[in-house]
């Protein structure tokens, strides 16, 4: 692939309106995920689990396509897409995760994935450069996700697809507590959207929703799968145990089986065909 055909110089975050805050947020995200790198590697890693529920919304794929994985982390989704398309580009703020992804791709003998450091708020690509743009589990890290979704739409060709997957807030009333505990766990967390907010965002900036998961899609995790030194794991566990004992609700829906505490989150996957 001729890389110059898709790359385009973009202003660094700090030089854009409101960019100081954006750059500071990016630095916080980078620091947080450097401490969470273990969640992306190894057979039990929470972000290394099966992505089939996302991939089914990406089909049908074409062997001629060029795809972009936004906030790609350690490139798990990019790795799944790669055999079905001509080229995948993965972009992420955190070099430590990109290195993990590059090592795993090399070990798997996958040569059509290009990983690069970059900001989802200012994607360094030309308009309409990609046939498919996918973003998994990242919107809740963006203070104003409309910026990133608009960028995804910009770099997707007319008629191409944008597919977004993320966890959702449990309710409008429960969002404040839910986001607050997420920030205790991961300081880079910004705000979770409601289902209708996510669909409105995509419809406004990309086009009509063509596929979406039914309300009620959830995933359940044991707490040890995602608590790291990036946040305050002891404080997080205290809040979950307090809820189990009848205390304030966190929105995490904790459950206890023996010594194991699990949490359950709502999530959504939405696909749209770029109209503008």
Locate the predicted segments by residue.
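A short SAM/SAH-binding and catalytic strip from SAM-dependent methyltransferases
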Residues: 132-143
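Conserved class I S-adenosyl-L-methionine
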Residues: 2-62, 76-80, 97-100, 163-186, 223-227
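Conserved Class I S-adenosyl-L-methionine
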Residues: 74, 208-276
């Amino acid at each position: 692939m001729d890389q110059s055909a898709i790359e385009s110089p973009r202003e660094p975050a700090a030089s854009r309106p409101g960019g100081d805050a954006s750059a500071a947020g990016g630095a916080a995200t980078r620091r947080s995920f450097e401490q969470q790198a273990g969640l992306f590697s190894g057979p039990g890693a929470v972000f290394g689990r099966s992505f089939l529920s996302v991939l089914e919304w990406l089909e049908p794929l074409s062997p001629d396509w060029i795809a972009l994985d936004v906030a790609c982390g350690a490139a798990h989704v990019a790795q799944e897409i790669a055999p079905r398309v001509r080229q995948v580009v993965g972009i992420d703020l955190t070099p430590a995760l990109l290195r993990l992804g590059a090592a795993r791709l090399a070990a798997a003998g996958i040569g059509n994935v290009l990983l690069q450091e970059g900001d989802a708020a200012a994607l360094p690509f030309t308009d309409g450069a990609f046939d498919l743009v996918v973003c998994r589990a990242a919107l809740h890290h963006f203070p104003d996700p409309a910026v990133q979704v608009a960028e995804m739409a910009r770099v997707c060709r007319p008629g191409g697809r944008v597919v977004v997957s993320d966890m959702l807030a449990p309710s409008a009333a429960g969002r404040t507590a839910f986001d607050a505990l997420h920030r205790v766990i991961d300081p880079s967390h910004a705000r979770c959207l409601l289902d209708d907010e996510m669909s409105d965002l995509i419809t406004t900036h990309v086009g009509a929703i063509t596929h979406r998961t039914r309300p009620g899609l959830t995933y359940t995790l044991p707490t040890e799968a995602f608590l790291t030194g990036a946040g305050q794991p002891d404080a997080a566990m205290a809040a979950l145990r307090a809820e189990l004992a009848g205390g304030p609700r966190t929105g995490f829906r904790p459950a206890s089986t023996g010594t194991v505490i699990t949490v359950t989150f709502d999530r959504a996957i939405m696909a749209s065909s770029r109209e503008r």
